[in-house]
């Protein structure tokens, strides 16, 4: 059996762990530049607030004290995610982390009282981390995702829904909107709706040739999994093959010297994430672009890839490569709205050397381990390369909560009276 452990309203739940006074209050979390809403509590959803809605449309609710708002705090969310995944792994070690708030798991088919196992795991995760989760078990990944949605929607499941026979599967398919099926989405869902397919059950009634002609192999995989036949299995290697850090800016930037510290910051984040997975990369790509939605303005977008001779996770090398790429593609007289850095061609574990390498890699590794230790104790911004400067000036985060779990200067103080 496959399973899904899905955190409920994850970003909001992370904020509520440290603000229990907001447990039953409407709460939203904003995107990087406080531009739009990327997470909502159930109470906020009930107010009609939609995902992706521009913040300015609901700002009056904040002013009227009817809505609580937080800027995205990804350092906090990433750390809370690791805590949740650690608890899940302690009970179900065969797992594939799918996203920051969701993981697939596998359990033996002969596990007794599977729903009880899921309910107990749900309680344990919330007790140990403060994060509520919904769990679904079924023969395939697609059905497990469906089961987790039912567990989230209906309180009677007590946090876990199990689809383990054809009767349950057929009932679930008949109740599940086609656009909500994993692998279908809104675009294909609308296309299917025009052909009379409203639910997952309607889609399963199509014959295989029809599905293949309309949607190709991905459609066949979804169609087959909805029948309870697994096609997607766990990918146990959780190391990423590429790592990207990017951001849109609140105000466009036209000056190269102002872009440099921002790109350096993205490159440093890539280096930190590489070291977390014990990886090293040779390819560093930097990209910049203007705002495509302002068609009246001059448009320009470009990227540059810099290849290093030896794979590295040294932030100094990665920042240097990213800045060389930036200087190659930067053009004056354009208003740049977004930039980012991607590292790829990642190797994990032992890094092959080069006869002509001019860097003392042993000495370098000692330095990087010292930096890792400092960052772990004092936060990811405790030590920086000078060029990073104050790159955060390009981000607008007016409502950011403290880094409760990753920065010693921001942990909660408890006073005993």
PLM regions with names:
Residues 308-417:
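Acidic, metal-coordinating catalytic segment for phosphate/diphosphate chemistry
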Residues 18, 64, 149-231:
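Compact, charge-rich alpha-helical regulatory domains located at protein termini
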Residues 98-102, 138-141, 279-283, 334-338:
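Short Gly/Ser/Thr- and Asp/Glu-enriched loop/turn motifs at secondary-structure junctions
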Residues 105-122, 196:
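Catalytic palm subdomain of template-directed nucleic-acid polymerases
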Residues 1-100, 104:
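Residues that scaffold, gate, or flank divalent-cation-dependent active/transport sites
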Residues 188, 193-335:
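DNA-contacting surface of Y-family translesion DNA polymerases
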């Amino acid at each position: 059996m496959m399973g899904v452990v899905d955190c409920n309203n994850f970003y909001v739940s992370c904020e509520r762990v440290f603000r229990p006074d907001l447990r039953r209050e409407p709460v939203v979390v904003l995107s990087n530049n406080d531009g739009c809403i990327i997470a909502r509590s159930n109470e906020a959803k009930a107010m009609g607030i939609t995902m992706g809605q521009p913040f300015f449309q609901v700002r009056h609710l904040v002013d009227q004290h009817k809505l609580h708002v937080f800027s995205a705090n990804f350092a906090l969310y990433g750390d809370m995610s690791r805590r949740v995944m650690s608890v899940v792994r302690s009970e179900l070690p065969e797992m594939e982390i799918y996203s920051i708030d969701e993981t697939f798991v596998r359990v033996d088919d002969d596990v007794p009282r599977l729903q009880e196992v899921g309910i107990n795991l749900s309680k344990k995760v919330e007790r140990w981390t403060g994060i509520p989760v919904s769990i679904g078990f079924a023969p395939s990944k697609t059905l497990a995702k469906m089961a987790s949605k039912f567990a989230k929607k209906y309180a009677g499941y007590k946090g876990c829904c199990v689809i383990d026979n054809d009767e349950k599967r057929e009932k679930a398919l008949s109740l599940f909107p086609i656009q909500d099926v994993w692998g279908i989405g809104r675009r294909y869902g609308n296309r299917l709706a025009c052909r009379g397919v409203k639910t997952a059950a309607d889609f399963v009634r199509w014959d295989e040739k029809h599905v293949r002609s309309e949607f190709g192999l991905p459609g066949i995989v979804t169609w087959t999994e909805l029948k309870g036949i697994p096609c997607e299995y766990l990918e146990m290697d959780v190391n990423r093959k590429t790592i990207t850090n990017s951001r849109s800016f609140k105000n466009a930037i036209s000056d190269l010297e102002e872009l440099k510290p921002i790109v350096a910051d993205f490159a440093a984040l890539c280096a930190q994430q590489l070291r977390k997975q014990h990886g090293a990369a040779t390819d560093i790509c930097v990209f910049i672009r203007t705002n495509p939605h302002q068609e009246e303005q001059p448009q320009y977008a470009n990227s540059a890839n810099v290849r290093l001779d030896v794979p590295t996770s040294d932030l100094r090398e990665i920042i240097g490569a990213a800045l060389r790429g930036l200087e190659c593609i930067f053009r004056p007289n354009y208003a740049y709205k977004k930039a980012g850095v991607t590292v790829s061609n990642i190797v994990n574990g032992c890094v092959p050397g080069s006869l002509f390498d001019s860097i003392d890699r042993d000495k370098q590794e000692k330095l990087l381990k010292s930096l890792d230790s400092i960052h772990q104790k004092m936060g990811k911004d405790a030590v920086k390369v000078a060029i990073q400067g104050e790159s955060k000036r390009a981000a607008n985060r007016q409502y950011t909560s403290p880094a409760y779990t990753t920065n010693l200067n921001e942990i909660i103080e408890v006073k005993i009276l």
